[in-house]
Structure formats: C-alpha cells, structure tokens
Amino acid sequence: MAKAYDHLFKLLLIGDSGVGKTCLIIRFAEDNFNNTYISTIGIDFRIRTVDIEGKKIKLQVWDTAGQERFKTITTAYYRGAMGIILVYDITDEKSFENIQNWMKSIKENASAGVERLLLGNKCDMEAKRKVQKEQADKLAREHGIRFFETSAKSSMNVDEAFSSLARDILLKSGGRRLKNNNKPPSTDLKTCDKKNTNKCSLA
C-alpha cells in the first residue's frame, strides 16, 4: 500500500513560555485559534501534510514547554528534529533577548546543520510592540536564517513560515532544486494586521 506522503519532517518549536507556541501550532495544524489553551507541560505534537513542489510532506510539529524546569524534557527532542522554529513575542523584549540562549541550546543539543527559522509572534498587537522588526531581521541575518513575523490570531504568515522551513529541509535533504532558493534568508511576506488586539498568551 502506497504511503500517503513522500517525506516526514519533524519540526520543533522552542522559545520562552507565553510567546504563543501552542497557538501557532494549533493555527497551522487545525486552522483554529483559542486564547484559553493550557500552558504546555512537557511535549505535545500535531500533524499536517502539505504539498511542497509536488511532494507531499508530512510535518510532525512538536510543541515544547518554555519553562526552564522542563529543559531536560525539551532537550531530549532536539536530536531528531529536522527543523527548529525559534519563537519570541514582539510585545516581550525579554523573550527576544532569550533567543540567543535558545540558539545556544540548539548548538549544544540539536543535530549539526539543522534548519532554523526565527519567528516573531503576536504581530497583531502592533500598539504594544517592544521588539522592532529591524532588530529581529538583523539577528536572523547574523545567523543566516529566515525570519517571519506572524499572528496566530489572524493567521498572518503562519502557513508561509512553516512552508518556508519545510522547503528548506526538502532542499537540504536532496529534494529537486526549488524555485527562488537564491533569495536572502530573511523574509517578510506580508504586513501584519495592526487592528486585532487579543493575544494568545500561553506557550
């Protein structure tokens, strides 16, 4: 019996507690938003199959707890990840500053050459912005990775971010040469909606 997919990619979302990791995953996997999710304890995952350049890619997206007390649990899941999304909250400067610590954690625990992507969430809360887009863009370029600002609430750039990472993994894993793969690593596809003010405050 033929498989329902061509490739299986394990993705991992990391970042401080409260940046909206769970909301992003639920938005991507189920196209749903609820700001009453219980903060993740340990590890949970969702699955969605997407079409990338004619290939069916099954994405297994793992949600991790951001609290330091769960760090050992999170670390156990780094090694099998083919792509890691580092998430911060644009209204929380500390969560952005801690991205450097999460980068260090990836270097110490993940497989060499794992694909990474920087993601600034809650861009629907422009009035409360504390982290400027230029700051994150600079950080992403320093590390040679892509950057998106997203809103789990409005769904802005969520699919684009996950699909971009999946394309990069497919290319690296020997997929046929993809279109537009010479574009700079930092991308911002759309302007985020500034009207919505509700947030997903849980991890």
UniProtKB/Swiss-Prot annotation:
Q: What is the top-level taxon of the source organism?
A: Eukaryota
EC number, as in UniProt: 3.6.5.2
Which PROSITE patterns does the record cross-reference, listed alphabetically? Answer: RAB
Binding-site residues for GTP, renumbered to this chain: 17-18, 20-23, 40, 66, 121-122, 124, 152-153
- Indicate where the modification Cysteine methyl ester is found in the sequence: 200
Q: Which InterPro entries match?
A: P-loop_NTPase (IPR027417), Small_GTP-bd (IPR005225), Small_GTPase (IPR001806), Small_GTPase_Rab (IPR050305)
Any one GO molecular function term: GTP binding
Give residues annotated as binding Mg(2+). 22, 40, 63
Question: Which coenzyme or cofactor does it need?
Answer: Mg(2+)
Intervals of motif Switch 1: 31-45
Q: Which reaction is recorded as catalysed by this protein?
A: GTP + H2O = GDP + phosphate + H(+)
SUPFAM superfamilies (UniProt xref): P-loop containing nucleoside triphosphate hydrolases (SSF52540)
- Top enzyme class, one word, equals hydrolase
| Example GO biological process | exocytosis
CDD domains tied to this protein: Rab8_Rab10_Rab13_like
Q: Where is this cross-link: Glycyl lysine isopeptide (Lys-Gly) (interchain with G-Cter in ubiquitin)?
A: 58
Keyword Thylakoid included in the entry's annotation: no
Domain notes per entry: Switch 1, switch 2 and the interswitch regions are characteristic of Rab GTPases and mediate the interactions with Rab downstream effectors. The switch regions undergo conformational changes upon nucleotide binding which drive interaction with specific sets of effector proteins, with most effectors only binding to GTP-bound Rab.
What's the protein name? Ras-related protein Rab-13
Lineage, broadest ranks: Eukaryota, Metazoa, Chordata, Craniata, Vertebrata
